[in-house]
Amino acid sequence: TLVEKCCKITTGESNTRDQIESGIYPFYIRSATVMRSNSYIFDCEGIITIGDGQIGKVFHYVNGKFDLHQRCYLMYDFDDIDVKFFYFLFSFFFYNRVIALSAKATVDSVRRNMIAKMKINIPSTMQEQKAIANILSDMNDGIEAIEAKRDKYIAVRQGMMQQLLTGKIRLI
């Protein structure tokens, strides 16, 4: 199945200068960093990937109101596909597609057809798609919890190093 047979594909309309630090809505730009905006142009569930920069490496799952940069692509309005499942599928395989296409020509930006004409295999039942998405989401949650714990230990170690190596705390 081609991606274009599964969903609609479009781009945003906003520019980076449209960001507002304390904005109401998420604003997805050409980066993994999510900015803020006081306006939204979409209110849907979908998948975003960037059009240039670290192509094939930045993906966002969205659900609700958001603003979107003009060089970002949104896949939405899916036909019988669990969107979170599609997020995992697309984010896993799209980078390899970018690499394969770059062997034929220099690829420094994404074109709509790179997404639209990508072949994907989708389990036939929504139940299987949801089961896969749930397992992968649980794994991501576990990884995030471990990373948060790791970051906390690093901060504690830094504090201990500061105290011990400056002599503020003595062990003997």
Regions from the language model: what does each represent?
Residues 75:
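Extended Lys/Arg-rich polyanion-binding regions
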Residues 66-72, 104-127:
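A short glycine-rich beta-alpha junction/loop motif
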Residues 1-13, 18-29, 126:
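Non-catalytic DNA-recognition/assembly elements of restriction-modification systems
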Residues 23-25, 44-46, 70-72:
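Short, surface-exposed beta-edge/turn micro-motifs
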Residues 6-7, 90, 164:
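Hydrophobic aliphatic residues
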Residues 122-172:
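Amphipathic alpha-helical coiled-coil/heptad-repeat segments
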Residues 13-18, 35-68, 81-88, 96-102:
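Short, ligand-facing micro-motifs at secondary-structure edges
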